Amino acid sequence: MKTIRLKYLTLLVIAAASLLCGGSTFAAILPYPNQIEWRPGVFRISEDLRVYCDSFFKNEAQKVMDKLSEETGLTYRFVDKKDADILASFSENVKPEGYTLEISESEVNVGASTQAGLFYAAETLKQLIQRANGDCCIPCVYICDFPAFSWRGFLLDEARNFQGKAEVKKLLDEMAALKMNVFHWHLTDDQGWRIEIKKYPLLTEVGGRRDSTQLNWYESCVYDGKPVSGYYTQQDIREIIAYAADRHITIVPEIEFPGHASAAIAAYPWLGCSGKEISVPCSYGVFSSVFNIADVRVQTFIRDVLDEVSDLFPSEIIHIGGDEVKYDEWQNSETIRQFMKDEHLLSPAELQIWFANYLSSYLSRKGKVMMGWNDITGDKIHAFQPECKVESRLDTRNTIVQFWQGNPEILGKTLERGFKVVNSQCDYTYLNYNYDKIVPGLEYGHTPIPMEKAYSFSPVPQGLECRPELVLGLTCAMWGEWINRSEIMYRMVYPQIAAYAEVGWTLNENKDFDRFLISLNGFKERWRSAGYIQ
């Protein structure tokens, strides 16, 4: 009853503020703040906003006010503190990325301890501004806000289908508005290599192209016959990194090792175990091609790639993939079998653990942290994997595990071992599981994820008592199979991404699905205007 009363009291206050401002509706806030106290009255916005900020925020304040002016049409100027009606102050007691926002009838006060906190305060402020009948105002309110999780991520797979710079920037804009802060960029896979590596130009010249694309579904023999290409130059990537940084988004690149390697092996056949020349696959699915990680030349290649990627991306974290490795080619390779014998490895699963530790150690020496899908821990999580003896252990010291597949007990065991974890449990966070929305009646093999289920997701599962502080947060994933047009991607991403944004930001005790649906209306209007949803 208390929750219901608070919900309707909040809506009444919003409605009252709207009436004071002369309108009939008022935009709610999303993701919802973790502490909010609505107060009577409104702050009426003059045509010329007078702004003061502490020197700590000088550059950030300029950027957020420019953006606010661009999006609302309001003008502003910086003034002395005594003359200001919007004041931004450094407040060391505010949590990282958090902010305070106090709006009275006479002024707006913002407090933050980080540049990101000021940025997020501005995003909230933009949602509070109401225009009606020629008037512009903000309801009086006190907000003390901070994220539930430090990692609030979105994954875009461009290896399967290249989207391009403009689309990536649009996604980054929406992530920023939703206070999401990690863009996980899946740049290589069987169907394409999308990042320029200067030392190995064939990765993009050959691996960045394919002759056609499979249509309908995995078992289909129908192809569109249209060549596909596209990749990012290193200059393109620097531009996108800078664009993301302006929005307080870290880009974590993913380069797939040792599986999902067909595009790379098509470019340089000596990277593989079979010795055969292959083409970049035109179909989707899990392929057998894997890197011959026992070959010194292949190890050098991998280090060279990681060197260029590490130099290019400021992110402390480099994602090495590691998922869905089929062991057939390793088991059939004399070189691999001898290497396993020399290294006293009992199974292909132990070989993968050895390789992950090798990459983790190398990246550590470069000042980077390795991240990989939870396959790298050696747990059996796929039906196609044989039962393997596993006595080796993945080193916890420089490794983040991204959990996507398996039961909660596997996640619990991973945390018990001391790994930091990002939770991307596929049955809750995969945006592509809703593909039947685009093609009605499609037999995908996965249960679609309705909005309410997405919203119910908790990065720390209920009943999991083991070291919840090691759960950094979540990443929702837009995998790229069948997403050959941006319009399809929009339909998959929006509005579902908003649920994951609130999962990452709003504490469980402050979540309310009915209230969330009301808050979502403002973003739906924004996305309709942009042409993302109907």
Label every PLM stretch briefly:
Residues M1-A28:
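Bacterial Sec-dependent N-terminal signal peptides
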Residues F26-F149, A477, I488, G504-Y532:
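Contiguous, structured surface segment used for ligand recognition
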Residues N59-E60, F162-G164, D190-E196, P258-A264, ...:
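Flexible loop/turn segments at secondary-structure boundaries
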Residues V94-I317, Y358, Y362, T475-G480:
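Feature activates predominantly on carbohydrate-active enzymes
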Residues A264-P269, S279-T399, W404-K413:
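Active-site neighborhood of glycoside hydrolase catalytic domains
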Residues M370-D375, K380-Q534:
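Flexible, acidic glycine-rich loops studded with aromatic residues
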